[in-house]
């Protein structure tokens, strides 16, 4: 039964995750943490941080880890297939439709109107993960880390992977001694 649940969870999340891997993360979170409890909020947050630091598409890394954690090697394969297949099929079908009707106000309206929904989904996920961080290390540490990260990415164009590594190091070397 776990195989069916894994397939459906990742198939639906990736089928509806318009905008790519990052847009499907809140949908995966809903399935993985809230619906099936395969991971806790903390486990999902840690996995997401590490997955962002590693090369490759985020959605496939999340599917691989969760699939393996919940269902071993068969779960790994099922979750990966469920992640890749809807995107590949949707890409083929939608690109043909969009290319054919690219000047249509309906197509333009559809692609533009979904963007605020994706933004809200990502904000909710950010809030949930941020709230856990605040509970774990407090407001001051969270604000300092957030501020430094924001500055490093916007002003200095630092790659997020370096910030994730720095946060891991800070969390392991400094926070335990505060």
Swiss-Prot record:
One GO cellular component term noted in the UniProt record for this chain: plasma membrane
Predominant cellular place of this UniProt entry's protein: membrane
InterPro entries assigned to the protein according to its UniProt record, in alphabetical order: CHR_Transporter (IPR052518), Chromate_transpt (IPR003370)
Keywords (A to Z) from UniProt: Cell membrane, Membrane, Transmembrane, Transmembrane helix
Domain of life assignment: Bacteria
Family: Belongs to the chromate ion transporter (CHR) (TC 2.A.51) family.
Name listed for the protein in its UniProt record: Uncharacterized transporter YwrA
Upper classification of the organism: Bacteria, Bacillati, Bacillota, Bacilli, Bacillales
Transmembrane spans: 1-21, 47-67, 75-95, 117-137, 158-178
């Amino acid at each position: 039964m776990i195989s069916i649940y894994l397939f459906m969870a990742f198939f639906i999340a990736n089928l509806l995750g318009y905008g790519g891997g990052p847009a499907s993360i809140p949908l995966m979170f809903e399935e993985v943490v809230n619906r099936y409890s395969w991971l806790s909020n903390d486990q999902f947050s840690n996995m997401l941080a590490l997955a962002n630091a590693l090369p490759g598409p985020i959605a496939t890394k999340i599917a691989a880890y969760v699939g393996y954690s919940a269902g071993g090697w068969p779960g790994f394969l099922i979750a990966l297939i469920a992640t890749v297949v809807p995107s590949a099929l949707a890409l083929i079908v939608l690109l043909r439709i969009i290319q054919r009707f690219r000047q249509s106000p309906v197509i333009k309206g559809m692609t533009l109107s979904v963007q605020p929904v994706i933004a809200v989904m990502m904000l909710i996920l950010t809030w949930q993960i941020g709230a856990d961080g605040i509970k774990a290390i407090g407001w001051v540490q969270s604000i300092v880390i957030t501020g430094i990260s924001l500055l490093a990415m916007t002003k200095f164009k630092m790659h997020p992977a370096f910030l994730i590594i720095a946060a891991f190091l800070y969390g392991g070397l400094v926070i335990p001694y505060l």
